Amino acid sequence: MIQNLPLAICCSTLIGMACPSLLAQAEQTLPREFFVSPTGSDANPGTRSSPFQTLEKARDSVRAAIPSAQGDIMVTIRGGIYPVRKTIVFNHQDSAPGKQRITYRAAAGEKPLFTGGVPVTDWKPYKDGIWKAPLDRSEKLRSLYVDESRAVMANSGKKIRAQGGWGTYTVTAGQAPWAWQSGQTADGIQYNVSDLPKITHNISDVEIENQTTWNKNFVGIREIATEGDKYIFKLQQPYGAIAQQIGWDAGLTLKSEQIIHNALELLDQPGEFYFDRDEKTVYYIPRAGQNMQTAKVVAPVTQTLLQLEGKPIKNRLRNLTFEGLSFAYTDYNLMEIDGSHGTATLQTACINTAFANPNWHYDVYRSYDVLPAAIIANAVEGVELKRNTIAHTGCQGIVMSNDIHDVRIIGNFIRDTGGSAITLGHPQHVYENDTPDLKHPEGAGIEHEKFPAGTESIPHRVLISNNFLPDNSALFNGHTIITVFFSKHVKIEHNWIENAPYTAIHLGWGWCDFDGYEGTNHPQWGKAPRPSVFPGKPTSVAGNNRVGANRIERSMTILDDGGGIYTLGRQPGTLIDRNYIRSTTFGVYNDEGSTGIVNRANIVQGPYQRVHTTGDHGRKHDIDIEGYYVTDDVWFVSSPNTRVTNNTICPNAVWPPQAQAIIHESGLEPEYRNIVPADWQPYNFDLEGVDPEWATGAVDFAVPGTPSESSRLVSQKGSQTGPANGRIFRQGDELCYRMKFPVGKKSQLVATYWGEEGNKRRFRIYINDQLLATQELYQAHPGKFFDQAYPIPPAMLPAGTHGETTYAVIRFTVEPDGGTVGGLFGLKVLPLPQ
């Protein structure tokens, strides 16, 4: 090799002399890289050793470099904090040309944070366990974060029953841009004086929260008066009227149970805060374990951190990637209309913006819009959001509404958003580029369309995949975690959604109101209370979507009339398959107008009310439901031309291999499982209804009447269950449990019994059909529960292992004349000292 070195140098020199243009061309095609660091300066050249300080400077430098760039451009962003006081905007001038790509990425192993918040420091004790700190801010504060935990606006705690409306507010059509119709609503709401303390300070910051079956609405107050034994909360107008002008009893109502927010007089619980705008002071009651002298406290100030905004159709923002970045602490102070504030909707992640027809279908949803988000995009193509973190938002996480093409939202960790984690599309996309004839006699015309003709396009070919989405919609509980309106060729795959207050995944829009049918009850499509808004003009924009291999655990934790996966409207060619849904109301819910959808090989594990819901109302039709694996045989399926075939009931979640494979493949794929924080504690279903102290240290346990038993009780004969002595028992002729035991270690089975059974009971206990013990119950421990331990001989356990544990079947069998097995109040496996 040493002898050949001069020849190599010579050849290299000759090539360089002969082909200088080739070397220059090769040099130009290498990716060009800029660097950003919190300790840099925007006066620097943006190199590794002299980085920029802001993303805006890097964007501008990239924009200048684009015309001469022959290859991809990289912007590497060092770890640290980047305060965002004004939204960072990328437009069509920031596109990568042709097949090139511009990537804004975190430096390897580092975590750059773009924050819309400011620190709140100098906390001092106030009184009654309340602390206070200065905050220079002119607007009210709806969110505060203490040691990464969301604090709660001071509130009434319990729901207060409204006592009816007060006064009259009159709207005349055309009096303002928001006044589309004439009408009258209440000008205020009455409450019993006995239900609330007297609120005297910063009245305009007080809010009413109104919960309906499937959503929540918020409206501001302008004045509080007292009349006899009633408080009169006078609404901020016109939004108070707009919130009442919502159909289907989904808006602000006058006699429902409500919660009052944001008054110092209501500050009385740990985790609550109140911001006094006049005094510019934040008040907070610490939660257990919080030290306000060392706590990290953040108040949000910026509503949107990143905006990607091309020119619709003609000049989209193209070929950008944002990777490994963190976005957090965004603000949202409700929608402002003519000085009034509120956020109200009929359903899911959109907002009513005008006093219009309560039947929003007649307006073609023109009075509704999407909401703000930490990241907003419009008119983009080939954009990728990958492995980013979004947290602690005042409203939504990501909103991409109009003209979204070939976008990938993959591998992101989005948590603790105020509203939806991801919203795609827009409710007004019923038709693209509406023509003047698309006007109902009682509705708004195209002059109220958000998207002028020639600028409107529904999302096409969008991938939402491998995102970890826990604990979202924290403020606006009616927002679905992933919300997709009208879309085509959209894939929602391998996402893990945990703890959704309403529906986890919402796909589609329009109900049956735009299917083109001129009547109500169609002979093949089924019933509906109303004809299509535009007979003979069906919407045809949506279809060929897929919702597959998602893991959805604990949806519908607060609201009702939704499910793990929920669909609306016509979307032929759409497939919902291989999803694992656990603990919800309805597993899959094909609601009004759902048409041309195949639901296949989904797993629905209890508790739930129904596996699948698709009734015969709302002209939903031509639906397939096939190959499901479920724990309880409870369905509501009566829509026309709907086929239910080859479904398997698996009581107690004893899954066959095919179902186990679906569960294993659902949620995050192996490449993306590292986006879950190492300290993340997934929800433990088994602990529901179980005394944590009793279960401490157990390798496995089963308690009657709880999820821990439902997944372990594999068979039973003559079984009975019910309450006794403050707990739930199970007894019967035979009970079989499949339990987990440690491998190669001593262990014992422990059963909890009542020590004062009225009749003598005698039964045998087997482990894998080998006799373990004989138990007799009578009155050995009067008036109390007791635990009986049964040491497990190692030879009784199977040789096959599952990691560090193995499974065995515990069978309780009553002896002749033994009465019954049990009552059994709990069963657990405990390790023994080795």
What residue spans do the PLM features occupy?
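Extracellular polysaccharide-degrading/modifying enzymes targeting complex plant/algal/animal polysaccharides
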Residues: 30-379, 384-389, 430-453, 677-682
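Short glycine/acidic-rich loop motifs that flank beta-strands on beta-rich extracellular proteins
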Residues: 86-87, 331-337, 372, 394-400, ...
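A short beta-strand element within beta-rich, extracytoplasmic domains
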Residues: 206-210, 741-757
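Right-handed parallel beta-helix
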Residues: 318-329, 361, 381-392, 404-419, ...
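Glycan-recognition and processing domains
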Residues: 673-742, 818-833
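Extended, low-complexity, turn-rich repeat/linker tracts enriched in Gly/Pro/Ser/Thr and Asp/Glu
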Residues: 753-762, 818-819
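Short, surface-exposed beta-strand/strand-loop-strand elements in extracellular ectodomains
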Residues: 759-771
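Extracellular carbohydrate recognition and processing domains
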Residues: 772-800
